[in-house]
């Protein structure tokens, strides 16, 4: 319970996209979210009924489309209560991409996005809008094991990022036979796929997304550039309380994340696996920044060239990961 005697809810949405039987197929994403589900059930006090899992396994009744993912996130936010201290958690494993940005002074002139199974992209703007809808006193932790995931919550403060000091650990790559696949989809690959569905010849990705998904398309694609900039400024100005968003990304915005296949068929995401290793080796509560830095160290020791990042307020950087009981 919180200080006011309200019962603290722990709510989660876990999404894994393997894109089976396509040229973009991955192998470890569903394993990632199933492992995370077991972890939050056994260690962090989550209940089975408060966890929604979306995967693109053939037998899955509800696929992780863009609309379904956003609907699940909205349901989670709607269940949260102001002043309750509710813990909201979103884990995504799948492809990520970058698309041309309309925002001024953007360091890479591109926006980050995740790639649901139907390619209805969810961008950093959509996640910013979601965070701004959180009731006061709740928190939203997002782990994205995808390429270009740094900065996936727009305007979130960088705590651990490209400017962070390296730990200088000597790599000691494991000798187990592995197959490494990037969890990145280049913009052109996304554009070509959408164009094959719409039959429209244009490099404007928004045209394709609006044609295919209409009002279910992301906010970035439904608003003209100037209106979007005005909305972003308005959302930032109205955010008076401490920002409740916490993003742990599998890599920097200009990097790729690895999908690792091993001989026994137990594939996994490199970042998700690093998180699991750190948690398994440390039973006590951990600060968010500790978890990310230790995951960085694990990846460096294993020889992976990706650098997990942390984006959140100063206060949340020192907060306990998922408020471990």
Swiss-Prot record:
SUPFAM superfamilies reported for this sequence: Caspase-like
Record gene name: AMC9
Family per similarity comment: Belongs to the peptidase C14B family.
GO cellular-component term (any): apoplast
Known glycosylation sites: 177
Keyword Protease carried by entry: yes
Main location: secreted
Major enzyme class: hydrolase
Activity regulation, free text: Inhibited by serpin ZX and nitric oxide through cysteine nitrosylation.
Site positions (Cleavage): 183-184
Alphabetically ordered keywords of this record: Apoplast, Autocatalytic cleavage, Glycoprotein, Hydrolase, Protease, S-nitrosylation, Secreted, Thiol protease
Name of this chain's protein: Metacaspase-9
Keyword Hydrolase among record annotations: yes
Record's function text: Cysteine protease that cleaves specifically after arginine or lysine residues. Does not cleave caspase-specific substrates. Required for proteolytic processing of GRI.
PTM remark: The two subunits are derived from the precursor sequence by an autocatalytic mechanism.
Domain of life: Eukaryota
Species: Arabidopsis thaliana (Mouse-ear cress)
Cited InterPro entries: Caspase-like_dom_sf, Metacaspase, Pept_C14_caspase
Result, substituting residue 29 to A: Reduced proteolytic activity
Gene Ontology MF terms: cysteine-type endopeptidase activity; cysteine-type peptidase activity
């Amino acid at each position: 319970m919180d200080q006011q005697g309200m019962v603290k809810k722990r709510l989660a949405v876990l999404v894994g996209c393997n894109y089976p039987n396509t040229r973009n197929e991955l192998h470890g994403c569903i394993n990632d979210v199933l492992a995370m589900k077991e972890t939050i059930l056994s260690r962090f006090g989550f209940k089975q009924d408060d966890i929604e899992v979306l995967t693109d396994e053939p037998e899955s009744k509800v696929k992780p489309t863009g609309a379904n993912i956003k609907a699940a996130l909205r349901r989670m936010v709607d269940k949260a209560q102001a002043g309750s201290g509710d813990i909201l958690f979103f884990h995504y494993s799948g492809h990520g991409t970058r698309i041309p940005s309309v925002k001024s002074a953007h360091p890479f002139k591109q926006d980050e996005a995740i790639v649901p199974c139907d390619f209805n992209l969810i961008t950093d703007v959509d996640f910013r809008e979601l965070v701004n809808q959180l009731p006061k006193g709740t928190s939203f932790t997002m782990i994205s094991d995808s390429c270009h995931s740094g900065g996936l919550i727009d305007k979130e403060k960088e705590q651990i990022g490209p400017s962070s000091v390296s730990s200088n650990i000597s790599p000691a790559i494991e000798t187990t036979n592995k197959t490494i696949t990037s969890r990145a989809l280049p913009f052109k690959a996304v554009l070509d796929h959408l164009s094959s569905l719409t039959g429209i010849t244009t490099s404007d990705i928004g045209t394709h997304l609006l044609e295919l998904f209409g009002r279910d398309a992301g906010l970035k694609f439904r608003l003209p550039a100037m209106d979007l900039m005005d909305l972003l400024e308005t959302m930032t100005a109205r955010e008076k309380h401490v920002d409740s968003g916490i993003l742990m990304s599998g890599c920097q915005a200009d990097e790729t994340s690895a999908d690792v296949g091993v001989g026994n068929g137990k594939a996994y995401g490199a970042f998700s696996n690093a998180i699991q290793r750190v948690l398994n080796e440390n039973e006590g509560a951990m600060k968010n920044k500790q978890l990310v830095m230790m995951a960085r160290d694990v990846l460096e020791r294993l020889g992976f060239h990706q650098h997990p990042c942390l984006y959140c307020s100063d206060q949340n950087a020192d907060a306990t990961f998922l408020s471990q009981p």
